[in-house]
């Protein structure tokens, strides 16, 4: 038995080594709230305007999304449906997979479940990490997904981003450092950093971060549209169990009072 256990440990070492070497960059955490309908509505707007030219959400229906996000059906059809689809149709696109493979080398993936597959932190950082790279076919690369095979569709909002040197705040043990006397942030020059060229995008950095966060919030909802319903039902179940426990305890005392 001991030999088998040792053999399993040794067999797992190459996998652990691979995971350590290919873990990717450290991801900035993002707080996603799928109960925020305003954020999801803005995310839907960004998704339909910037993503649905190539990516579908074919496991969702326009009607279900409209109802969940509190959008009237006529508004959904006029602002988020550009293909002549009906309110009960799936959120598909007109591009055929065979054509997409010919044009791009591979068909763009469906994004209905991408937040479940990749995670919200990964999506948030990926969408903010495109930078100019003339050596790539679309002129851009990505810090989170090196040699990415898609263009930066949000460049008009974010602006042109390049890799260079800039002053960044000192971080020790995961905490940002400040001057103890003045309270100003302590900085140092770091290279291989992403920098947005001034006045090349329609949004400032804070606005763009919020726009991406809202898009990721919508994708998180799309990946699990019944999450809030499950949480609500779970609350009722726990309340029922707590209520039932009181009567179960009283019944137990009644059964055992003669024994004790």
Task: Please provide the spans of the model-predicted regions.
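Electrostatic cytochrome c docking/interface patches
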Residues: 20-45, 56-67, 223-231
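Sec-dependent signal peptide recognition
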Residues: 2-9
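Juxtamembrane interface at the cytosolic side of transmembrane helices
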Residues: 230-260
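Short, aromatic-rich amphipathic segments at membrane interfaces
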Residues: 197-234
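The canonical Cys-X-X-Cys-His
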Residues: 47-58, 215
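Electron-transfer interface patches adjacent to heme c in soluble/periplasmic c-type cytochromes
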Residues: 70-143, 148-182, 189, 193-208
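Stable alpha-helical elements in mature extracytoplasmic
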Residues: 36-39, 46-47, 107, 119-123, ...
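N-terminal signal peptide c-region/cleavage motif recognized by signal peptidases
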Residues: 14-17
